[in-house]
């Protein structure tokens, strides 16, 4: 053990007294975890990352979900209102000749 620490700038050699070379070897014998895909994806597939911020994208999605029901309800009310009420725009009854004196 002293040969291993010989050239190191250490003041107290007892700092390394608990070091055991056997423990280092045991840790390196474990196999690393490997990702195994469960689906086959085409090799031509191109992965593109979105440039928008993740938080902003999430907030927009939540806002769309929240307001989708309101928007649908409003459209239904408008459709029902159009069938029973007269149209909002009314055809002009005055002729264009009346405004020529200006």
From Swiss-Prot:
> Keywords assigned by UniProt?
Acetylation, Phosphoprotein, Ubl conjugation pathway
Its pathway is: Protein modification; protein ubiquitination
Q: Where is the composition biased (Basic and acidic residues)?
A: 66-75, 91-102
Its GO biological process annotations read: positive regulation of proteasomal ubiquitin-dependent protein catabolic process; protein polyubiquitination
**Xref: InterPro entries:** DDA1-like (IPR033575), DDA1_dom (IPR018276)
Leader sequence range is none
Name of a matching Pfam family: DDA1
Which segments carry the region annotation Disordered?
Answer: 66-102
- Sequence positions bearing Phosphoserine: 33, 95
Can the keyword Phosphoprotein be found in this entry's annotation?
yes
Q: Does the keyword Phosphoprotein apply?
A: yes
Q: Which residues carry this modification: N-acetylalanine?
A: 2
Q: One GO CC term of this entry?
A: nucleoplasm
What does the record note on quaternary structure?
Answer: Component of numerous DCX (DDB1-CUL4-X-box) E3 ubiquitin-protein ligase complexes which consist of a core of DDB1, cullin-4 (CUL4A or CUL4B), DDA1 and RBX1. Component of the DCX(DCAF15) complex, also named CLR4(DCAF15) complex, composed of DCAF15, DDB1, cullin-4 (CUL4A or CUL4B), DDA1 and RBX1. Part of the DDD core complex containing DET1, DDA1 and DDB1; the DDD core complex recruits a specific UBE2E enzyme, such as UBE2E1, UBE2E2 UBE2E3, to form specific DDD-E2 complexes.
Task: Tell me the protein family, please.
Answer: Belongs to the DDA1 family.
Q: What does this protein do?
A: Functions as a component of numerous distinct DCX (DDB1-CUL4-X-box) E3 ubiquitin-protein ligase complexes which mediate the ubiquitination and subsequent proteasomal degradation of target proteins. In the DCX complexes, acts as a scaffolding subunit required to stabilize the complex.
Name of the protein in question: DET1- and DDB1-associated protein 1
Organism annotation? Homo sapiens
Q: What is the lineage of its organism?
A: Eukaryota, Metazoa, Chordata, Craniata, Vertebrata
